[in-house]
A protein has these predicted regions:
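Conserved redox-cofactor binding core of oxidoreductases
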Residues: 1-59, 65, 128-153
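Active-site rim elements
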Residues: 18-22, 90, 155-162
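Glycine-rich loop(s) and the adjacent beta-strand/alpha-helix scaffold that form part
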Residues: 52-55, 59-153
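Short, intrinsically disordered, charge-balanced linker/junction segments flanking boundaries
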Residues: 161-170
Length: 170
C-alpha cells in the first residue's frame, strides 16, 4: 500500500516515520515544539479527560481532571481529540458519541449515533519473510561487516539517506 492512512491498508509498504531534517524524532519535536508558543494553543499536561461537552452537536468544551480537581476549558473554533486508539473512542463514548445500545444502558446521554466508535481496534500484523539468497548484495551482508557499517554511517552522515533512515521495523 502506498499510504497506510488511506483506509485501505491491505498489503505491504514502507512504514511512515516522523523525521525532521533527516533525523528521526518524536511527534513532539516534529510537530508540537514548532507551534507550542502560539497564542491560540494551550498545552495542559498530567490531565485526564472526563468528557467533551457539545452544543448542537458541536464540540465546545472539554472537562478534565488534574489530580482530584475538575476543570473545564472551552474552544472558540475547534477541539482536537488525539488520545490514541483506546483513549479517543473511550472519550467519545463517555461524551455521548457511539452505539446507543451500549451507551444508553450506561446512562450516557446520546449526542450522536455512530456505531463504529470503539468497535474497530485492529492489531498491526507484521510479517517478515526470510529468504536465503546467493550472489546478491543484501542489507544483511552490509550490516554484518565493519566496513559495511562504516559505509552505512557515512551515507547517513553526508546524504541523510540509506539504511539508517529506515524505521526500526522496516
Amino acid at each position: 500500500t502506498k499510504d497506510f492512512n488511506t483506509g485501505d491498508n491491505h498489503g505491504c509498504g514502507y512504514f511512515q516515520v516522523t523525521e525532521k531534517n533527516g533525523f528521526r524524532c518524536s511527534t513532539a519535536v516534529g510537530y508540537l515544539n514548532p507551534v507550542k508558543k502560539r497564542s491560540n494553543l494551550k498545552i495542559i499536561t498530567k490531565a485526564h479527560v472526563k468528557k467533551i461537552n457539545f452544543e448542537n452537536k458541536v464540540a465546545k468544551e472539554v472537562e478534565y481532571w488534574i489530580e482530584n480537581k475538575l476543570f473545564t476549558v472551552s474552544a472558540d473554533k475547534e477541539i482536537i481529540l488525539s488520545s490514541g486508539s483506546i483513549g479517543s473512542p473511550q472519550i467519545l463514548q463517555v461524551s455521548g458519541i457511539g452505539n446507543p445500545n451500549k451507551l444508553k444502558g450506561l446512562g450516557i446521554e446520546m449526542i450522536h449515533e455512530l456505531n463504529g466508535v470503539g468497535e474497530n481496534l485492529q492489531d498491526h500484523l507484521m510479517f517478515r519473510p526470510i529468504y536465503k539468497i546467493q550472489n546478491i548484495k543484501s542489507l544483511n551482508k552490509k550490516i554484518n561487516s565493519l566496513f559495511g557499517n562504516l559505509l552505512i554511517g557515512l551515507e547517513y552522515i553526508f546524504n541523510r539517506s540509506g539504511p539508517m533512515t529506515m524505521g526500526a521495523s522496516q
